[in-house]
Amino acid sequence: DLMRYNDGNIYSVGIKNPNPLSIIAYRQDWLDKLGLEVPTTLDEYYKVATAVAKEDPDGNGVDDTFAFGGYQNVDTTWFDHIFGAFGSLPNYWMEKDGHIVNGSIQPGMKDALVYLNKMYKDGLIDPEFVTDDPKRWQQKVKSGVYGAGVTKIHIFDQNNWSNYYEPFIQAYPEGKH
């Protein structure tokens, strides 16, 4: 009843999801060094993630690389590429068979969580991905800890260049983009 207006009706104003599209940015130099292509399937993705985390692509002789990481207080968009591959997107409403359904309760959700759990247990995801603060995460990205990163496509907008993209160009001037 708290949501009801004084005429007894419940009103809502829908909004477009404010989150821009997520993309995966790969370290092409590491893919080249490992003899791998940008993955196009979940099996290929797991193979690339394993190679990045286990085959020392930075060549420093230390087990210190991960497929990717993240930082605290960020929503599930870090993993939208995984959830989406299984037909489930947490926190999103989607059209399915002519109905609007919640992505968090779709049948593929469990399979996506099992897949992510395996990646985590196998050491492919930085175990500090939920505790690092944004500055620590960015420092890890710049220092070459991650072979890929999930980010918002808007960082490649020229208006955001100095805030997001330029620091990585400075850290990896030979990088392909």
Language model features with spans:
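Extracytoplasmic/secretory soluble proteins
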Residues: 1-177
